[in-house]
Amino acid sequence: MLVDASGRDDAAVVRIADDRALILTTDFFTPIVDDPYTFGQIAAANALSDVYAMGGRPLWCLNLVGWPREKLPLDALGAVLRGGADMVARAGARILGGHSIDDPEPKYGLMVVGEVHPDRMTTNAAAEVGDRLVLTKPIGTGIVATAIKKGAAPADAIRAATDAMTTLNDGAAAAAASAGVRAATDVTGFGLLGHLGAMLLASGVAAEIWAGAVPWLAGARRLAEDGHIPGGTRRNLASASETTSWDPGFDEVEQLMLADAQTSGGLLLAVRPAALPRLLASLFSHGTLAAAEIGAVGAGRPGSIQVHRGSYAP
């Protein structure tokens, strides 16, 4: 066992040979968009992301389904499964089966098995003092999804969020491997502050980030100001408050945005300064939605984060 639940990592990793290890993870959730096919795509991309966060590639998947068959047509379930299957195929993996139950609320996701060379896996326990922090997708999907549920999200925000959530993290993982990155996590339900804090705590280090360097989805700030804040985002901020310090002048909306609960978010990478140019160039060549240097790892109380205003200036 190379990685288990004790490290708060994205997946378990089990060595099966000197040069091969299996990655095991699972994830599922309720719909966050109206279209069933798109929901299937998003749920699959979100589940596959944990494999990419560990530096691996997905191999096999099992469908996990909860469906209210007396309330929703099976045609809609078929669309969900097609969306998931198409995303898994895009990742170069295969769905081998799965399990379904009758459920009052629809749910879909995957159990995923991937592989990685044991010497090339990335974990959230390998960040070092001096590393630069790079984010590969804009954030704000939780805010936009909440507005979608209320019928308040404009078309540009829906489009931007959907594009982000249906983009695989395969290119980001490949770029990280090419730059020798050893510390990575994906930004999902605990938000940027939560997942960064977990990485820092596991690595025994602290960090500074600059709010102005963090990329945002189109329309997310406006929707947050209008009050479309998920409950999970508020809980994330409350949880992060014990380890996060803020420069003067931040309002609650700005703080909540950095804690926004993400679905199928990007990778957060900690890279040595000498390898940063290679990483950024590779991210651009792989067409990732962002390649944003947002801060740096430093010494300090493990897990602590200092948030500055403005853009990052190393």
Predicted feature descriptions by range:
Residues 1-8:
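Intrinsically disordered, low-complexity, positively charged segments
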Residues 2, 99, 125, 136, ...:
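Glycine- and other small-residue-rich loops at beta-strand/loop junctions that grip anionic moieties
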Residues 13:
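Phosphate-centric recognition/catalysis
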Residues 16-32, 38-41, 57-154, 192, ...:
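Glycine-rich anion-binding loops of enzyme active sites
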Residues 37, 157-164, 182-183, 254-257:
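Short pre-catalytic strand/loop immediately N-terminal to key active-site residues, enriched for Gly-Thr
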Residues 38-54:
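Alpha-helical scaffold segments that flank or form the walls of functional sites
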Residues 69-94, 101-108, 178, 184-314:
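Glycine-/charge-enriched secondary-structure boundary and capping motifs
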Residues 111-121, 155-176, 250:
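Active-site glycine-rich loop that binds ribose-phosphate moieties when present
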